């Protein structure tokens, strides 16, 4: 979080609940979406999130299945809503946690709320939901010394930790590929104290490379998302819908289509399907981070959704 904060999206620009549900319905019943993830920004800021999840869980795809529903959150206030989210139909959850040290957490988030995040993690564990994944971005000179402590914290609680290479989006001038902590660096640091074996689980379209991990009597899995050094673009099947109704075919895309504007100008469901499909078909072969002509997206991560 920049010291000066981020620009808040004006409320009239944000999709209404009915608009969100309409587009999610189209994605599931017309476009073949089988997994829906609510992310952000911070999805828990939406007081009606449980209602949207409930409506999503009631949808039926053409093959008779219901969509899998996941949530990515910073965990603030999660302890008070976890039960209701599960009751609404939430299947899986990812919680962002970049540090176990209060001062480091504060410097990264500009909030003295680490205890609230940990309470949210405890609430997720108590709810019985599985899997619970912890998302951690490792940054040089900030939290690279917490790679092993975070891994032990998660393994001892039955959580699946996912380390993520810092990407050139929302990082601005602080991102330098030559200085970034790579997936190889992370695996090297882990291997000094934790036993790692490549997982035999099929990766499919998942972004993380999985490792079986163990230390003392604790066993589990650790994932590493090497979006910069080992791009997985060829296996990516995601489409992103922003809070203000723009559809994007890549996290790093600079092109997007406003389904919100189409809806508010009377578009039919068929019109929306056609626009969404066209955007998906325009997906590039790769994100291009490692190309000399790469252009960093103008939207921050909080305005796109991870």
Which residues fall in each region the model found?
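Auxiliary Fe-S-binding modules of radical SAM enzymes
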Residues: 152-156, 166-306
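Radical SAM/AdoMet-radical enzyme domain recognition
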Residues: 14-37, 46-164
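Short, small-residue-rich loop/turn micro-motifs
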Residues: 1-4, 97-99, 165, 251
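Short, flexible helix/strand-to-coil boundary loops that buttress conserved ligand/catalytic motifs
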Residues: 1, 82, 109, 251, ...
């Amino acid at each position: 979080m920049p010291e000066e904060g981020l620009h808040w999206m004006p409320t009239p620009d944000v999709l209404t609940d009915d608009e969100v549900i309409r587009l999610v319905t189209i994605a599931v019943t017309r476009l073949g979406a089988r997994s829906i993830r609510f992310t952000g920004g911070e999805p828990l800021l939406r007081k009606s999130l449980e209602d949207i999840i409930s409506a999503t869980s009631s949808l039926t795809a053409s093959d008779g299945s219901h969509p899998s529903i996941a949530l990515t959150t910073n965990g603030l206030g999660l302890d008070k809503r976890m039960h209701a989210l599960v009751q609404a139909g939430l299947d899986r959850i990812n919680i962002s946690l970049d540090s176990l040290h209060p001062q480091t957490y504060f410097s990264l988030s500009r909030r003295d709320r680490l205890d609230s995040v940990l309470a949210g993690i405890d609430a997720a564990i108590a709810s019985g939901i599985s899997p619970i994944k912890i998302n951690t971005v490792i940054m040089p000179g900030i939290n690279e010394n917490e790679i092993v402590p975070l891994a032990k914290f998660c393994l001892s609680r039955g959580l699946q930790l996912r380390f993520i290479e810092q990407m050139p989006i929302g990082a601005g001038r602080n991102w330098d590929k030559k200085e970034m902590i790579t997936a190889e660096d992370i695996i090297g640091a882990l291997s000094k104290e934790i036993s790692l074996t490549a997982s035999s689980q099929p990766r499919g379209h998942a972004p993380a490379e999985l490792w079986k991990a163990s230390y003392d009597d604790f066993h589990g899995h650790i994932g590493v998302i090497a979006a910069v050094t080992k791009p997985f673009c060829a296996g990516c099947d995601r489409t992103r819908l922003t809070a203000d109704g723009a559809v994007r075919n890549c996290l790093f895309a600079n092109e997007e289509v406003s389904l919100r504007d189409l809806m508010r100008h009377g578009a039919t469901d068929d019109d929306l399907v056609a626009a969404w499909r066209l955007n998906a078909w325009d997906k590039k072969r790769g994100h291009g981070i490692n190309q000399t002509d790469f252009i960093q997206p103008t939207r921050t991560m909080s305005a796109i959704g991870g």
